[in-house]
Amino acid sequence: MKKIIICFIFVFSINVSFADATSELIDKIKNIHSMTANFNQKLIDGQTNNNLNSKGNMSLKKPQYFKWITTSPNNQEIVSNGTKLWIYDGDLDQLIIKKVSNDIAQFPYLILLSKNTNNINKLFTVTAQDNNSYILKPKNDQMIDSIKIKFTPNNQLEYLEISTSLNQFTKIEFNNVKTDVDISNTSFDFKAPQNTDIIDETKSA
């Protein structure tokens, strides 16, 4: 009987720990109402041993606005106004327009824009490494192995780490972070440059 009680206490304490970590992470994400930052991104491909470094800037405004602009080594922009998602490749002069989806596997940083942060509990098992670092393990997603979110002591986003099932590792470090800034909604509408090849998937059946 003692063993059963001890096992129950152990399992219960683990569940409480997961719940506390999830609640802490949700509180931190909820406190990000708007944000601008520069980023440095490093992609390590374990299959080819190739590394790719890129940098740029991003901005978000809850509940639906998002912009991710890569300025080096190539010009790429991902912009969403909550209804449409524009993916622009400046080198190819190509723009793909999609309907917005909450595909965290494709864009892991969308977790920061989640309209219902309680969904984090449904999608991930969350553990806290310390007061400012959290590991998210997807419950169903087969593309992502884990996401690590690190905050600074004053609760600003410091970096994201994403590991995938394809043996790829991405680390995105943020700097010059500003939160609760006033950002115009119209800045999240994308206007294609002249002579851009446009593929509008929102018009497909």
UniProtKB/Swiss-Prot annotation:
Q: Subcellular localization, per the record?
A: Periplasm
Highest rank taxon of the organism: Bacteria
Alphabetically ordered keywords of this record:
Chaperone, Periplasm, Protein transport, Signal, Transport
**Keyword Chaperone applies:** yes
Q: Name one GO biological process term.
A: lipoprotein localization to outer membrane
User: Residues of the signal sequence?
Assistant: 1-19
- Disulfide bridge positions per record: none
Q: Which GO terms describe its cellular component?
A: outer membrane-bounded periplasmic space
Per the similarity annotation, which family is this? Answer: Belongs to the LolA family.
**Quaternary arrangement and interactors, per the entry?**
Monomer.
Sum up the protein's function in the record's words: Participates in the translocation of lipoproteins from the inner membrane to the outer membrane. Only forms a complex with a lipoprotein if the residue after the N-terminal Cys is not an aspartate (The Asp acts as a targeting signal to indicate that the lipoprotein should stay in the inner membrane).
Protein name in UniProt: Outer-membrane lipoprotein carrier protein
Give the organism's phylogenetic lineage.
Bacteria, Pseudomonadati, Pseudomonadota, Gammaproteobacteria, Thiotrichales
